[in-house]
Structure formats: C-alpha cells, structure tokens
C-alpha cells in the first residue's frame, strides 16, 4: 500500500519536528513550473510527478497497492519528495555549521548498508529489481515509509550520512554514546539548537500545490487534494524504465 511519512533517521535519535524546523525559512514568489526551490536549487513539478509515477509503478508491479491511488496518497507522495530536499538542506547546513564533511565514501557506505538491509527484507520475494528499487520498495512496505522514489535513494543515503555525522559529533561533545537509548533525551536537547540555527539559515520555497505553511508550528501542511495525477502513459513509461534498468543490471 502506498503511504508516506517523514523521512526516517539512520541515527538512533529520532527528532520529532526536525523536518518542520526547516520550513520556517521560506518566502517570496515561486518560479513558474517549480515545485520547490531549496537553497537556490529548483525542482520542477514535472520532476516530482515523474518521481511519484515511479513509486506508483513500483508498488503496483509488486502488488502492494489494491485499487486506485487516492488523491491523499498522491499528495503525500508529492510532499514526501519535497520533504526529502528540505531534510537534505537542513542537515547539510547543520553539518557545515559544525565543520563536518560528509564524503562520497560516507554516502556509499550508507547506501550499501541500506541496500544490504532492504534486499534482505525483500529476500523472501526473490526481488530482482535494481538496488535503488529494492530500497524504495522496502521503504514502501515499511510502517514508517518516507515515500522514496528509486531515483532519490542516493539523496536519501546522503541525508542519512549527514544525520549520522551531526549526531555523532554532538554525542562526542556531550560525552554520550549515540547508540544508547537512555541517551536519547540528552541528544535531542544537544541537537535542537544546532537544527534551529540551521533552519534559520537555509532558504526554502515550496509551491502551495504541495501544501501550505502553518506559522504557529513551522510545519508544512499537505494540500488536502492532490493535483498530481500521473497518466497511465506516465506510469507505463516509468514501468518501462524500471524494466530496462533491471535488464541492464543498473541501479
């Protein structure tokens, strides 16, 4: 079944509201055709629609969705694509403020762990898709699904690597073991000012089509109805692309 919730964290610490903090830095008119502009990087409506189409195609191909995809599901998937970009900007800024560097090797290590974990999860189904599709499908099956599209798995892995670096840095400063559940409250307290500072520094604009801002909670509230309606042709095209990718053995 298609569903999406805020991006899961690789670290043991889960910060409720970490995503929401980033949405406070916004304003100004949207560029034509833009779904979001995050730190000056423009993501188009077409890109988001393609990502949503690829998720729908993946879950339908693997019989996870019964019946038609609802407006609420489409809205959640569209918002999830934007939320991932905001997450990336927030944690990248936090890492930069702390003087931390996350390398491509760190990203590769994180993605490799995700692929190994998620392929094991799908093992009983003898999943033959690409590594990125395996991660996206395992995400779709989980109770904490974040609405990952196969094409955004590398971004997701980078976000996890950023989170891990920032959490470990704050844990070291506070002389805390980040893997000890008893330290979660203390780590949350240590991370809060870091994320608040980062949230005030990033620049985020989101199209009202994907929701609206609640100033009282600094959260993006999803639109009640979704304008994202992938056509059968778009879903079929996404299916063909996935099949072609599987045939070539690519991610």
Predicted ranges, named:
Residues 8-11, 79, 155:
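Alpha-helical transmembrane segments of integral membrane proteins
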Residues 19, 33, 88, 154-155, ...:
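A broadly tuned, weak detector of single residues within folded domains
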Residues 50-77, 152-185:
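Well-structured core secondary-structure elements of compact alpha/beta domains
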Residues 106-123, 181-206:
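Short, mixed-charge aromatic SLiMs
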Residues 126-174, 179, 192, 205-209, ...:
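Proteostasis/folding factors centered on peptidyl-prolyl cis-trans isomerases
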Residues 1-73, 189-251:
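Short, low-structural-confidence N-terminal segments
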Residues 29-142:
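N-terminal targeting/tethering segments
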């Amino acid at each position: 079944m298609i569903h999406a919730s805020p991006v899961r964290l690789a670290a043991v610490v889960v910060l409720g509201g970490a995503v929401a903090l980033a949405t406070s830095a916004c304003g100004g008119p949207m560029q034509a055709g833009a779904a979001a502009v995050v730190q000056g990087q423009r993501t188009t409506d077409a890109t988001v629609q393609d990502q949503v189409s690829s998720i729908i195609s993946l879950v339908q191909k693997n019989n996870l969705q019964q019946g038609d995809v609802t407006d609420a599901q489409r809205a959640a998937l569209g918002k999830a694509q934007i939320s991932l970009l905001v997450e990336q900007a927030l944690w990248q800024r936090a890492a930069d403020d702390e003087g931390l560097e996350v390398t491509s090797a760190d990203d590769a290590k994180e993605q490799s762990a995700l692929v190994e974990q998620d392929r094991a999860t799908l093992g009983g189904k003898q999943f033959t898709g690409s590594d990125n599709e395996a991660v996206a499908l395992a995400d779709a099956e989980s109770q904490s699904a974040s609405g990952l599209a196969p094409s955004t798995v590398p971004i997701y892995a980078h976000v996890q690597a950023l989170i891990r670096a920032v959490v470990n840095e704050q844990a070291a400063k506070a002389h805390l073991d980040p893997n000890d559940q008893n330290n979660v409250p203390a780590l949350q307290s240590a991370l809060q000012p870091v994320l608040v500072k980062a949230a005030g520094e990033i620049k985020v604009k989101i199209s009202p089509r994907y929701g609206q801002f609640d100033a009282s909670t600094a959260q993006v509230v999803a639109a009640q109805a979704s304008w994202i309606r992938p056509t059968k042709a778009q879903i079929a095209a996404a299916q063909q692309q996935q099949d072609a990718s599987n045939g070539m053995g690519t991610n």
